[in-house]
A protein has these predicted regions:
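Active-site glycine-rich loop that binds ribose-phosphate moieties when present
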Residues: 137-162, 171-174
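Active-site rim beta-loop-alpha module in soluble metabolic enzymes
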Residues: 158-166, 170-217
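Sec-dependent N-terminal signal peptides
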Residues: 3-13
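Alpha/propeptide regions of enzymes that mature by internal proteolysis
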Residues: 41-76, 82, 93, 215-222, ...
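Short beta-strand segments
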Residues: 24-25, 76-77, 116-120, 169-170, ...
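C-terminal accessory domains and tails appended to enzymatic cores
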Residues: 73, 208-283
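A glycine-rich helix N-cap at a beta->alpha junction
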Residues: 92-109
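Mature N-terminal segment immediately following signal peptide/propeptide cleavage
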Residues: 17-35
Length: 283
């Protein structure tokens, strides 16, 4: 999800004809997905199964949002460089953003959204969740203004800069718990939970889709109740890498605005959270 900032920049004020919803999808939080060696990347034995399960959960969220009066639902495929969803698979009334190299100017245009939903979301690195990580399995911790965040918090902070709230999340139980620390009123659906070191207990796909559709419907109907999560400015982001991630760290240090403050720690600073992420993601 390294390019997530580019897909949340285009947030704005409420639409007149009905809420416009932006869905961030990922795969590690989908029900039934628990094996990084078999289910997460193209060519792996069960990857096609994971794609099918992801599409089902995403489409359930789309259906629920539309039933509640959403005028537009745009999905960003946030897994594996936007290669996990196909336009053949998504709800016919949804739109799909794909491609990690999409020009940033496209997302800095006039597209406006009223709420963000997460589908298939995992918890931050270090959390006791299913396949928990932050951007990559090389990152140990990420802090925004001293607060630990994962991908959920990063999206929430960027959206908050544009006064857009997170309204719903589906994923594993740890991800649901995480979003509620930032948005206590968010609708959540825990489609699975960790029951061992790597084993999970998941809802059936049919039940997961039903609960996601209901939650998305409720979230859109309640959209006026949600407040964005805002960071004080200026903003500092600190990234701590695991030992052995020297190659990733070296690549990060090629970014002109970074500062290495400890052997495994890099800091970025900016006037806004968006500026900080542009420093991080722009080589």
């Amino acid at each position: 999800m390294n390019r997530l900032v580019l897909f949340v920049v285009a947030m704005g004020i409420c639409a007149a004809q009905g809420p416009k919803i932006f869905i961030v999808s990922d795969m590690e939080g989908v029900g039934g997905v628990n094996n990084a060696d078999e289910q997460l990347l193209p060519g792996q034995r069960r990857y096609d199964e994971s794609r099918r399960l992801l599409a089902g959960e995403v489409n359930a969220a789309v259906a629920g949002a539309l039933e509640a009066g959403a005028s537009l639902v745009v999905i960003w495929d946030g897994h594996d460089s936007s290669r996990s969803l196909s336009i053949d698979d998504i709800h016919p009334r949804a739109q799909l953003i794909q491609g990690s190299d999409t020009p940033p100017d496209y997302y800095l245009g006039e597209k406006l959204y009223d709420g963000i939903m997460f589908v298939g979301q995992h918890a931050m690195a270090g959390a006791k969740g299913v396949l928990s990580h932050s951007q990559s399995f090389s990152v140990q911790n990420i802090f925004l203004n001293g607060q630990p965040v994962g991908e959920i918090g990063q999206v929430a902070a960027i959206a908050g800069q544009f006064d857009i709230p997170v309204i719903m999340l589906s994923g594993d139980q740890a991800a649901c718990d995480e979003v509620l620390t930032l948005q206590p009123k968010a609708e959540t659906v825990a489609v699975k939970r960790l029951v061992g070191k790597t084993s999970t207990l998941s809802l059936s796909h049919a039940e997961a889709r039903l609960q996601i559709q209901v939650a998305a419907n409720r979230a859109v109907k309640r959209i006026s109740e949600f407040k964005p999560w805002k960071l004080q400015t200026p903003v500092e982001m600190k990234i701590e890498y695991y030992p052995g991630a020297a190659g990733v760290l070296a690549t990060t240090l090629n970014h002109g605005e970074s500062k290495q403050v400890e052997p495994r720690t890099v800091v970025y600073r900016g006037r806004t959270v968006l500026e900080v992420y542009q420093h991080w993601l722009t080589p």
